[in-house]
Amino acid sequence: MNILFFGPNGSGKGTQGAILKEKYSLPHIESGAIFRENISKGTELGAKAKEYIDRGDLVPDDITIPMILDRLQQDDCKKGWLLDGFPRNKVQAETLDATLKKANMALDIVVEIELDREIAKNRIMGRRLCVNDNNHPNNIFIDAIKPDGDKCRVCGGELKTRSDDQDEAAIDKRHNIYYDTETGTLAAAYYFRDLAAKGGSLKYITLDGAPGVKEVAAELVSKL
């Protein structure tokens, strides 16, 4: 089962991915982690990516997509994978789709978690990250996942706050990219939605991200 996740920052996308990872024993692959791994290992692609990152530039697709494909072809992905954080625009979606097909790798399910921008922003400003696992849900504004004081509600680990999670301008910038249906991340999601509508094996699932973590997870599992 190969699954691609879409959702704005604050939608709980990472949390839902972590739940599916545990339930189905699938690797949860985040594009940022792929960059960090390649750079730390000193791979040829990692070295090229680092040059762009150090300049503050976006890493081009001809570097990013081969990295992602290499990760998806590793042994732990043979029974399936969850990909999160890529693609971020329609061109990347088209390129990823063509690359997977060329590699004889099927994309089975695309999940889009929908959430109002204002709700998403409030969630971001209230979230706290566990030093042991960023996907442990802790949010000072949501009763169901409020942390245990200054400790993670899941494992008791130390909590930290990302500086850009408290920067409204930075949050708005991220959301502007995501919610743009012409050139942004939603344009990538809708590319796959349109593919699924044409028939074939690809399934496109939309979820309301407003309810609690357990409710969203239950709906997601029921639709898979």
Swiss-Prot record:
GO terms for molecular function: adenylate kinase activity; ATP binding. It holds the Pfam family ADK. It catalyses: AMP + ATP = 2 ADP. CDD domains: ADK. Residues 126-165 are annotated as: LID. Its main location: cytoplasm. Monomer. Belongs to the adenylate kinase family. PANTHER family: NUCLEOTIDE KINASE. This is Adenylate kinase. The lineage of its organism: Bacteria, Pseudomonadati, Thermodesulfobacteriota, Desulfobacteria, Desulfobacterales.
